[in-house]
């Protein structure tokens, strides 16, 4: 029951965020399994930056089949800097094509820097969703991606 309430609140927050956010055009493809929640860059980053989502909820949504890649790779270094994780900037700048594992990225941007050493393993193990997209001027590219083999 608590999980359902959290997910409902998250959906409502995201509807508001999409309506207000200049990044609202950066969507994410939903997974065919589970709840199929699309998770583009703004839908993952906004609640985290606002303090409205922790890693347990994000992991739960991933297990339920929500997913999509992270578009807007040019924004990731900015997001890291805003969170005070400047030590992540070299890795973020090198990941020009988007991140193949949004769960790993969320953990690090959320302050769990000890996971940095696990990034290569997590990105190659199929634990996450496919990475995708970049950031185009104007509307912006969608962060795409299918579920990895680990799903």
UniProtKB/Swiss-Prot annotation:
GO CC, alphabetical: extracellular region
Main subcellular localisation: secreted
Annotated keywords: Secreted, Signal
Tissue expression summary: Component of the acid-insoluble and acid-soluble organic matrix of calcified layers of the shell (at protein level).
Subcellular location: Secreted
Residues annotated as signal peptide: 1-19
Protein name: Glycine and methionine-rich protein
Species of the source: Lottia gigantea (Giant owl limpet)
Lineage of origin: Eukaryota, Metazoa, Spiralia, Lophotrochozoa, Mollusca
């Amino acid at each position: 029951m608590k999980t359902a309430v959290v997910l409902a609140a998250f959906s409502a927050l995201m509807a508001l965020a999409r309506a207000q956010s200049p990044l609202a055009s950066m969507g994410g493809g939903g997974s065919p399994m589970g709840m199929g929640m699309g998770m583009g860059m703004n839908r993952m980053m906004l609640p985290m930056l606002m303090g409205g989502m922790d890693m347990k909820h994000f992991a739960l949504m991933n297990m339920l089949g929500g997913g999509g890649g992270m578009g807007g790779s040019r924004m990731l270094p900015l997001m890291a800097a805003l969170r005070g994780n400047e030590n992540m900037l070299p890795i973020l700048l090198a990941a020009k094509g988007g991140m193949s594992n949004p769960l790993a990225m969320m953990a690090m941007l959320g302050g769990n820097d000890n996971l940095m050493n696990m990034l290569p393993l997590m990105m190659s193990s199929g634990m996450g969703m496919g990475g995708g997209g970049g950031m185009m001027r104007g509307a912006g590219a969608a962060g795409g991606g299918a579920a990895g083999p680990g799903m």
